[in-house]
């Protein structure tokens, strides 16, 4: 990898680290300014500072920023980081830039798990865990189908993922057909759309540790993932 002002000797430069911290922070503050109630940047910053100082100038503005928009922004940042790490990990594991959770059937599997959990009126944590289990089942199912071919071609892996996605999509459609159209079906639809409207601090406390732990594990294994992304000859030459 060639050195640049962002990466030198395989490591991020101080400028890159500062940029990665400032960009989501500034973007998040700007996003909290927009909505049905438009707010100036100064009011948003003052409301955030009020969390630590305890001095609230405008209770309405404070409620909108801190209780509504801030948890949505935090959840969007954490979920985005998790999706980024998941996509990059898939591509490294399978040495294929096309190997994404969508193509390998993971997305469809997790959707089936979430739909089933919502129909059974499970809690937030139970819904996430069941979705995770079904996602792993989808991965194993895809690998099992692709393993039937001895050539080891990534084309068969992608085709197996398409088969898994079609199967789990069909199961998901059947489950949605049996769901209560007045209660469960809207909740399922909002979940599948990935809306952050219902984001709360409680949901952040429940879901964030799972995502952050996964990101930490991926970070600790980053060098091994880099080796897996190389071809066989490149990996041997690297030791």
Where are these regions (language model features)?
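Alpha-helical transmembrane segments in inner-membrane proteins
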Residues: 1-238
């Amino acid at each position: 990898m060639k050195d640049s002002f962002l990466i030198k000797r395989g490591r991020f430069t101080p400028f890159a680290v500062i940029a990665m911290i400032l960009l989501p922070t500034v973007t998040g503050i700007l996003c909290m300014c927009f909505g049905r109630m438009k707010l100036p940047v100064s009011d948003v910053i003052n409301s955030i500072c009020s969390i630590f100082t305890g001095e609230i100038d405008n209770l309405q503005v404070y409620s909108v920023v801190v209780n509504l928009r801030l948890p949505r922004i935090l959840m969007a940042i954490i979920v985005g980081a998790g999706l980024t790490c998941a996509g990059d990990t898939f591509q490294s594991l399978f040495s294929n830039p096309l190997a994404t959770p969508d193509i390998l059937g993971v997305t469809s599997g997790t959707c089936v798990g979430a739909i089933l959990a919502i129909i059974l009126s499970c809690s937030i944590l139970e819904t996430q865990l069941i979705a995770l289990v079904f996602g792993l089942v989808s991965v194993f199912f895809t690998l099992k189908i692709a393993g039937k071919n001895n050539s080891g071609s990534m084309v068969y892996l992608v085709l197996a993922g398409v088969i898994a996605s079609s199967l789990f999509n069909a199961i998901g459609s059947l489950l949605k057909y049996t769901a209560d159209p007045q209660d469960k079906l809207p909740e399922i639809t909002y979940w599948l759309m990935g809306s952050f409207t219902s984001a709360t601090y409680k949901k952040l406390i429940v879901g964030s540790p799972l995502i952050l732990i996964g990101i930490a594990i991926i970070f600790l294994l980053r060098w091994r993932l880099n080796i897996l992304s190389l071809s066989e000859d490149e990996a041997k030459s690297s030791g």
